Amino acid sequence: MKVLVINPGSTSTKVAIYENERCIFLETYEHSPEELAKCETLMDQEPLRRNCILSALEKAGFKIEDFDAIAARGGILPPLESGTYVVDERMVNYLKHESPVKHVSNLACVIAYELANGKSLSTPPIPFQSTRWCLRRGFLAFPR
């Protein structure tokens, strides 16, 4: 299984590729204050960071269709039961418009959803809250 991992930070975007449990690519892209200042809102950074990820994949010789899944670092979501969730349109809308905290981790799921949109991944994008996560059967829908 090949997994793309997206981890946006306040001034960087980290991209990793895992094949089964082994990291085969890891890159950190630093964003200058000037680059980030061009974005009026946090969500305005989405294209900038998405393009960084696509550049990283190109550098590593991959395209989105090569992945079985995309894992996205967290996001400020409402309290949820422990488990694995699918990043769907409702979750993306929540992170963009309803999340009580405008945090850079909200971008990860939005970017993952955009990257996966229209692609035939065997597993839809999933959020994770730590570096140790697992895929499970029976994905839960994001609650309202």
Regions found by a protein language model. Give the residues of each.
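Short secondary-structure capping/turn segments at boundaries of alpha-helices and beta-strands
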Residues: 2-4, 59-60
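Short glycine-rich, Thr/Ser-proximal phosphate-binding strand/loop in the N-terminal lobe
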Residues: 3-44
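Conserved active-site "lid/cap" helical segment
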Residues: 29-71
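Glycine-rich anion/phosphate-binding loops
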Residues: 46-52, 99-107
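Short beta-strand-loop/turn "lid" adjacent to the catalytic site in phosphate-handling enzymes
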Residues: 57-104, 121, 129-143
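Long, well-ordered hydrophobic secondary-structure segments characteristic of membrane-embedded
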Residues: 72, 108-111
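A structural motif corresponding to the C-terminal end of an alpha-helix
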Residues: 110-123
